[in-house]
Amino acid sequence: MLDFSVLEPYFPLLVNAVWITLKFTFFSTIMGFIGGFILALITLSKSRVLSFLAKVYISVFRGTPLLVQLILIYFATPQLTSYTISALEAGVLSFGLNSAAYISEALRGGILAVDKGQWEGAMSLGIPKHRFLLDIILPQAIKNALPSLVNESIMLLKDSSLVSVIGVADTLRWADLIQAKTFRAFEAFIVAAAVYYVLVMALNFLGSLLEKKVRVSD
């Protein structure tokens, strides 16, 4: 017999766990977007060396499991440096670096979709390259790559449960700790699954609204 009332005393802890999940996803997405944009520009640059290095980076992070990257960063950072990285920092760093590899490909496609005439027009008008990239190219690249960016954010949110492996007190970690205390594993993980589902549906809804708004502006 299911008994969710056993979990009620632990719901305040769940609120904090959900907040950590959202905060983690937000910072990972921001880091992934910034890194992805830089990588996209490098892969499109005229420097063969930089372009090659960027492609190697993308290949490595897309070709190896995210969980392995997470564990490597968490345990190798203190070993290779004098800095003791926290579990949350290791999670944001590994997810951000991984996400950048995927977002870069989406943004690269978005940049290539921008009409070449705009590049030529900007050069003829003498617009500084950095202003042209940030003010003209980036907004259009985001618009072109928006569906892929929304999907990547959703994947980050779902995959955020992996950080519980290194001890981050996120939503899945909450369920794991509560089932150990109450021995109600099914109820605890059902609640965690429901929370993730609601968060993903909310993010998907916001993404759909944003895509509609962008289409209307066209």
Model-identified regions with their sequence ranges:
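Transmembrane alpha-helices and adjacent helix-loop boundaries
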Residues: M1-D218
